[in-house]
Amino acid sequence: ILVRGNTNLGDMNQVSGSLMGVSVVLPILNEERDLRESVSAILAQSYSAPFEVILALGPSTDRTNEIAEELAARDSRVVLVDSPTGRTANGLNAAIARAKYSIISRIDGHAEISPTYLRDATELLNKTGAVNVGGIMAAVGKSKFEKAVATAMRSPLGVGSSRFHTGGKAGPADTVYLGTFKKSALLEAGGYDERFTRAQDWELNFRLRKNGGTIWFDPSLVVTYRPRSTIKALAKQY
């Protein structure tokens, strides 16, 4: 793995009050459309503890990697690692291997987190004792096609009845959208299984629960998700 950025200094458990340092990890492939907005939302977080943003760059065919280089040049908190296969699980594991903080927050390159997301997620980890917390996947489209997909993604008829799609009460769950993890539990479980090209999150959360950990859903954690813009891109996702 080629790392561009500061050398990893190990697992740095820096604390600001009760908040721990966070490594935000993103698997990135062909995210030219949304990458700037996604990373900007992370860098603008209202979070008093230190955090970093690790982009695992796959073999994109658009301007994604150029944009990532620009973001890293402008802000030292942005770190780039190579993910030669471009697969989600591989990229996440590459980013986690580079992470220097004790909390891992997984975000996507076409998703935007709310301004207090990192603070809220970290506080929930402390409050609930869970090993992973997550909330609502708020799908929002801009084009007619994206809006139609977003509507389907918010409906039980479109994607099933998972609370992270349709909402619900806070509490233990089988899985959550994206997730903010205790790094120790994530490493103990072995990280993401790179044999999976789909459902990596569900499978990882299954192993975390098998190890005795709690997965916690809370609707106050909101992530705005922009659906794929074409039928072809959507088909690749599912």
Describe the role of every protein-language-model region.
Residues 82-99, 120, 176:
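Glycine-rich, basic loop-to-helix element that forms the pyrophosphate-binding segment
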Residues 63, 109-124, 206:
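Acidic donor-binding/catalytic loop of UDP-sugar-dependent glycosyltransferases
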Residues 40-50:
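Short, acidic, metal-binding catalytic loop of nucleotide-sugar glycosyltransferases
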Residues 57-66, 85, 108-111:
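A conserved acidic beta->alpha catalytic loop
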Residues 193-238:
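Catalytic donor/gating beta->alpha subdomain of glycosyltransferases that bind UDP-sugars
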Residues 116-147, 151, 221-222, 226:
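Conserved donor NDP-sugar-binding/catalytic core segment of glycosyltransferases
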Residues 140, 161-184, 196-199, 203, ...:
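A recurrent flexible, glycine/aromatic-enriched loop bordering the glycosyltransferase active site
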Residues 104:
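Short aromatic/hydrophobic "clamp" motif used to bind/position activated sugar donors
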